[in-house]
Amino acid sequence: MSKPLVIVESPAKAKTIAGFLGSDFVVESSIGHIRDLPRNAADVPGALKGEPWARLGVDVENGFKPLYVVAREKRDQVNKLKALVRDASEVYLATDEDREGESIAWHLLEVLSPQVPVKRMVFHEITRGAIERAVADWRELDRRLVDAQEARRILDRLYGYEVSPVLWKKVMPRLSAGRVQSVATRMLVERERARMRFRSAEWWGLDATFGKDGATFGAVLAAVDGRRLADGKSFTEDGHLRPEAAGVVVLDEAGASGLAARLSQSDFVVRSVEEKPYTDRPKPPFMTSTLQQAAGSKLRFTAQRTMQTAQRLYENGHITYMRTDSTTLSQTALAAAREQAVQLYGPDSVPSSPRTYQRKVKNAQEAHEAIRPAGDTFRHPREVARQVGPDEARLYDLIWRRTVASQMKDATGLTVTIRLGGTSSTGEDAEFSSGGTVITFTGFRRAYEEGADHVEAPTGGNGADGDQERRLPPLAEGDDVEALGFEAEAHATKPPARFTEASLVKALEEMGVGRPSTYASILGTIQSRGYVWKKGTALVPSFVAFAVVGLLERHFGELVDYGFTASMEDDLDAIATGNEEAVPWLTRFYFGNGTPGLRPMVSDHLGEIDAREINSIPLGTDDQDRLTVVRVGRYGPYVQRGDDRASVPEDMAPDELTLARAAELLEAPSDDRALGTDPGSGLTVLVRTGRYGPYVQLGEEETGDGAAAAGGKGRGNGSKQAAKPARVSLLKSMTPANVTLEDALRLLTLPRSLGSDPSTGEEVMALLGRYGPYVKKGSDSRSLGSEEQLFDITLEEALVIFAEPKRWQGRGGSAAPGRELGEDPAT
């Protein structure tokens, strides 16, 4: 007997939903997208390989018609779904209710071609009630959402496939450009440029301790002789006093210490007491971006880790759909949150009517609720923690507290600001300021403070981030207070903080660039492409990012313009609502209409781009008028002054590479030396030190545009063809000072072929990687016990190692090489 077939994206979701629907339904997953634009030339059907548009996968001359292909790895699953469709009484397409989910549903419909009724089934949480309602309240496929997603996909393909090759030719291979990733990279580079321009300004202040009726409290110097004391806002980014701050007092160490001494015997009186009501309002429930921000700052989760954890919570029925830019709660959720607050914190914890929140996100468009605990009643974090892993438990706790707190009353209290004054022994009038806050009603803060392993700092309306309760003794205007001590305190302006994953997501969201579902993947891409690396939680742009952003700003400025990129999101929204047609819009973007389109922009500018100029970042000139630049080389960044070069240390951030630091690198003694001549080739054998440590090299490399020595100082010969010489890292037992020609020639035999596996024909190699010695056969790698084995292990011994079960060592053991991450820079 035929049964209804429900198709979802993931096996985990299919398993959960099948449990709710029972044996009357068949539930299967598509395992994500089943087809897409071709990833490479091999995916393009033979009959179309000769077409001029084949590399794009989009026929730009024929209405931007996309070429869709079923991925090889999805063909078995597609065949399985086709068989299930043939036996089904009806088909429910139950993919996520957003543009991407609607697109997946449409592709399923196109590929499977069901001959039975097809229904679009949507839900925002995976609970029994939600799934049963979704089966009953199905709808038709929304073709406008499909068109909008298709336009977005085509746009990103055109952008990436047209601009990325420019980067390969002018900067280095394997780079990529993208509508959102290039803007994100520009933001990181601009912030680093600001840090490089920054010059710190120093000033001194005075901290005081006062006493009254046995109670003590602190205060800071606010004014001298009626003139305000300087603070961080008084200075520009280059360390100068702002014009509007011309009248402020700027103390140095001697001035602050001297004033402290002159005030040590002074009498002080309370000059004013100002009281203001204090209100701290709860934040809205989470949407995707704010969840990523909170999980990043409170749990130290990356955006990707947050989304993967949220996905598992969603698929197992613990939270609602996690890709949304809505802060709205359904009536059911409002009731559940209020009920939970009343149960845990009493009837006085909630306001008389539910709280609603207005979305402030530019281009907000997702149709879902905010992210909240699933169900008509919320399960307490302790209950959920017994059923999920540690990451899931911590993230659920964060979501639960934020949701419940959003429906509780404000925290209220009183903020008191006191001004105290006295006269120094030389007649100077010194005024100090002290403030305190007393919380009289904790309100929503109870949801964060009670029983939490981590506390999200409550912030809101009138409260500053991280407001802490600070009590002052009862004081009135005219009261005498005792000065118990003074301490001069140094202060300095700080450069603008680098972005973290959380703050970058927030900035992109505020500008209307990207979508909730894209932020995690964008952050992953800019890191995997080498545009950024992490220093703690801070995102540090590489010099490669500087070169790429410089090229795009100079020659493709519109493509990384924040306003233009956000306007594209507006246009895609208009396509989704039917107010814009995809093909005319893509035509304007690609071919132009009054302004240059993408294709002419690339073809017209490519010849103008000077690769050497793009890959050079000036640091300045020294006292001998010699220009020092950072160059992006094939083997890493290096500094150059005249003919002298030196590698930039791998862990050096751009703002740390000052002109003085570059001079130190250039003038440092070099470990480079010639060891002798290779008898076989006649080439010089050298030992050098590069960004990944010391290595031996056979012959001098040729350098051209964008190529440079991997380490130490050297001279280029101006050749346009860059040849990469053989290089091998030194063994742990070797140093540049003690390595001999014999050692080097032995190292240069690596990687060493041991022969082929008789059973599979695969070549077996002995290699030295960044993480130690190992043998490799096909995609299988095994660590070796010692570096000496590299030179004497036989094929038979290697095959014995491969025949044993792979053992992953714990602490103190030899770590298995794991998956391949790429070529070792030396070998």
Model-derived regions: residue spans:
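Basic, low-complexity terminal or inter-domain segments flanking catalytic cores
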Residues: 2-5, 15-16, 23, 45, ...
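Accessory interaction regions appended to the cores of large information-processing enzymes
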Residues: 29, 69, 165, 190-191, ...
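A conserved hydrophobic secondary-structure block that centers on an alpha-helix together
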Residues: 96, 292-294, 298-302, 306
